[in-house]
């Protein structure tokens, strides 16, 4: 039987050192052991503007309630 770990999260658009935008996932409670000390960034397509990245992060915050990790 699989072991499922879950946590609430939120997303924020940030600009990386290379100038490209990413959406960063922040965990609320650090209850997912695999992600407790990790940073999870979602790479965006080249040419994504700051406004597009911000709107995407806002949309994700409106629709995503958490993260599930399924460990076999």
Residues covered by each model-derived region:
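A short, charged, amphipathic alpha-helix used as a generic interaction element across diverse proteins
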Residues: 36-71
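Short N-terminal "domain-start" leader segments
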Residues: 1-33
């Amino acid at each position: 039987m699989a072991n499922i770990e879950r946590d609430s999260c939120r997303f924020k658009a940030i600009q990386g050192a290379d100038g490209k935008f990413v959406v960063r996932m922040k965990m609320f409670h650090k209850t997912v052991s695999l992600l407790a000390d990790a940073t999870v960034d979602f790479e965006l397509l080249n040419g994504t503007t700051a406004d597009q990245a911000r709107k995407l992060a806002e949309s994700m915050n409106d629709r995503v309630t958490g993260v599930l990790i399924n460990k076999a």
